[in-house]
C-alpha cells in the first residue's frame, strides 16, 4: 500500500490562477485499496509513467518560512522520487502566504501547453534520473497512473519522517554502506507494503534532508501539525464553493467533509498500527537472521523506546551518524551535478536537431507517406509513444504559462536553466531511429495513424505477402509435379506404344511364319495325297489289265476269238509295263517324300511344346504305314482278280515281302513280346530310335512338362500277367481259326471250286491269312463274326457293271485317310475270305453291295454263256449256281419288294418306296459330305501327328 494512496486533488480558480486542493474523499478499507491497486496495475501494465516537473518561482519570504519550505519540498521530492512518481514540487507566492498564515499547504501544478519537445524532455529527465538511481523494474501504482499528482497531509509527512528516522537508527547498527542500503530497503518494504523495487537513493535523500536540520526537527513537526489542522478547516470552507470549470465534477461523490475527516483519522490510526506491527516483525526476523548484532534485551528496550518516543530517539541517533550521512550527501550531490551537466549537453544537441524545420518535415510526411523522414518520424514516434496525460491548465493569462521547466535540487536550492533539460531526448531519438526505417502508409490525407497501428498493418501486410509467396510456391510446386507426372505419363505411353508395336510386328511375323509353315504342310500333304492316289490308280489299272489278261486266257482256252481283245491289250501292255515301272518309281518317290516330311517335321517346332501339353509320339510310323497301306490296297485289288495263277503269283510276292517284315519284327520281339502287333512293334522301335537320336542331339534334359520323353501306349490287354496274357492270345488265335473254318464250311461251292489251283499256292495264301490273324490278336470277337457273316451272305450276288465300278471308286476314296488298322481289317477280310474263294470263283462271285440305281439291267439267269464250257468242274459250278439262282428266284417271288405282283396294298407300297427314296437321297447327301470332309480330316490328322516331333 502506497503512503499517498487515498488522496485526490482538484483544481480551482483562486484570484484568477489555477490552484490544486484536496478533493473530498470516500474512505475505503485497506483490503479494497490494495486489491484496487492490484487490479489497476493489471489493467494498465503498458502505460508509460511520466512525471511533471513544475516551474518554481521564488519570492521573498521570511528566513524561517524559507527553511520550512526547503524541508517540506525536499521531503516531498524525495518521497516522490522514492515512489517513482518523478514529481518536483516548488512553492509559489500563494504557497508562501499560506505558510506565513499557517493556513494550509497547497501544491500548485502548472502545466503549460508547451511543445511536445518539452514534454518529451521532461519524460526523459525522470526516466534517466530514476534509471541511474536504481536499475530495477519500475513499479507503477494505480494512483500515479490515474493522476500523477500527490498531496500529502501533515500527518502523512510526520509518518514519513518517523520512518526515515527509524531507518537511520537501524543503519547505525551496521558498519558499511551496503548494509545500510539493505536495511533502508527492508524497512521501506515493510512499511509501505510495496515490492522490493523501491528507490534506495530516495532514502538517502530523505536522510540528507533530515540530517541538515537536526535541531529544528521538533519545531518542524509541531508546525506541520498546526498547518494540517488549519488546512483542513480551509479546505472545508473552500469545498462549499464549486467552480464551473472542467474539473468541477471530480470527487463529486465525496463532498461530505465530516465523513472525510472521520475516515482520515481512522486511516491514520490504522497506518500507525500497521507501521508498528511491521517494525516488530522486522526486528523478529533480524533476530533470527543475525543474532550477533544485538542482544535480546537490547532489542526489547529499543522497541519500547521506539513506540514511546520516536522523535527523541531519532534526534539522538542522527547525532551519532552525522559523519556517514554527510559522506553520502556529498556523493549524491556530485552525482546529481554530473547528471545536470549531461542534461545540459543533451539539450544543446536537441535544440540543433529540432531547429531544422520540424513542422515542414511533419507535414511533408503527412502528405507523402511513401517517403521516409528519419528525423521527423523519430519525433513523431517518440511523441506518440510517450504521450502526456491529458490534464490542461485553464488560465485566462496564457503568457504566464511557462514553456520551460527546471529541475530543483532540494538541498542546495540551485535552479537549472530551461535549456538544460532538452538534452535528455537524445537517447529516445536513438531508440526511435531504429524503428523509423519502415515505410508507413496512412489511411487518408488528413489522419495520422498510430505507429502501433502502422506496425500492425505492416506486419499484416508482411504476413499476407509471405502467405501469398507460400501459396505461389505451392502452386508452382504443384504445377511442376503435374508437369513431371505428365511427362512421365507421356513417356510411359510412348514406351507402351513402342512395345505394342514391337509385339504387333512379332505377332505379324509369327503369323506369317505360321501361314508359311501351314502352306508348306498343305503342299506336302497334297503332294503325298496325290502320290498315294496316283499309286492306287496305277495299281487299280494294273489289276484291271491283269484281270483282262486272265479273261483273254480263259476265253482262249474255251475256244473263243480273242484277237480283238489281244489287240487292245497289246496297246495296254505297254502302259501296264510303264505303269509297273511307275509304281516302283512312285514307291521310291514316296520314300523320299516321307523322308522329307520327317526331316521337316523334326525341324519345325510344334505348338504343343509351347503350351506344355504332354503328347506321345503316335505319328512316327505314319509314312511307312502309308506305304504299307498302298501295298495293302494293291494286294487287295490283286487278290480280287478272277485269275487264280496271277493272283497266286502276286500273293506269293506280297507274302514273301510280309515274311521279310515278320523276320525283322521277330528280331525286335526279343526286346518286347513275341505276339504283339506289327504296327505296335514298328512304332515302338521307331520311337526308341527317335528318342536315342534326340538324346544324342540334345544331351540337356528339357524343361518340365515340355517335350517329355514319350511313353509307349500300353493297351489294357497287355497289362495282364504274362501267363494270363499268353492264354488270352492263344484263345484269340484259336477262335479266329475256328471262325475261318466255319466260313469255309458255310460256302457250299468252296471245296468243289479247286480247279487248277496248286496246293502250294493255296498253302501260301493260307499261311498269309494265318500270319495276318497272328498280327491281329487283340481285335474284338464280334468284328470278324459280323464281317464274315455279311460277306458270306452277300458273296453270291450277281455283279452289275456300273454299280461295281462305282463301288470300287467309292471304296478306294473312302479308305484313303483311314488309319492302318482299318486297312488291316480289310486285308483280313479280302485276304481271309477271297483268297480262298478266288481259286475257283468266277466273275459273278465278286461281292457287290446292293445299291439302288436308276439303271435297270434285265439279266436272264438261264441265259447261256458266249461259249460252251470245256471242263466238268465248270459245269458243276454252273449247276450249283443254277440251284442257288433257283432258290434266290423263289425268294424273290415271295418277296413283295422284288415281285410287285405280290403286293395288294399299293398305297402302302408307294409310301414305303417314297420313304426309302428319301432315305436314299439323305444317305447319298451324307456320303458326299463324308467324301468331301474326310480328305481335310486326313490332312489334320497328319498335321497333328507330325506336330508332336
UniProtKB/Swiss-Prot annotation:
Keywords: Cell cycle, Cell division, Cell projection, Cilium, Cilium biogenesis/degradation, Coiled coil, Cytoplasm, Cytoskeleton, Disulfide bond, Microtubule, Phosphoprotein. Pfam families: CCDC66 (PF15236). It is found in: Cytoplasm, Cytoskeleton, Microtubule organizing center, Centrosome; Cytoplasm, Cytoskeleton, Microtubule organizing center, Centrosome, Centriolar satellite; Cell projection, Cilium; Cytoplasm, Cytoskeleton, Cilium basal body. GO terms for molecular function: microtubule binding; protein homodimerization activity. The modification Phosphothreonine is found at residues 115, 121. The modification Phosphoserine is found at residues 369, 606. Residues 691-714, 789-809 are annotated as: Disordered. One of its GO terms (biological process) is cell division. Residues 474-558 form a coiled coil. Residues 570-949 are annotated as: Mediates localization to cilia, centrosomes and spindle microtubules and the interaction with PCM1, CEP290, CEP104 and CSPP1. One of its GO terms (cellular component) is microtubule. It comes from the Eukaryota. Homodimer; disulfide-linked. Interacts with CEP290. Interacts with PCM1. Interacts with ARMC9, TOGARAM1, CSPP1 and CEP104. Interacts with CDK5RAP2, CEP152, CEP192, TBG1 and PRC1. Microtubule-binding protein required for ciliogenesis. May function in ciliogenesis by mediating the transport of proteins like BBS4 to the cilium, but also through the organization of the centriolar satellites. Required for the assembly of signaling-competent cilia with proper structure and length. Mediates this function in part by regulating transition zone assembly and basal body recruitment of the IFT-B complex. Cooperates with the ciliopathy proteins CSPP1 and CEP104 during cilium length regulation. Plays two important roles during cell division. This is Coiled-coil domain-containing protein 66.
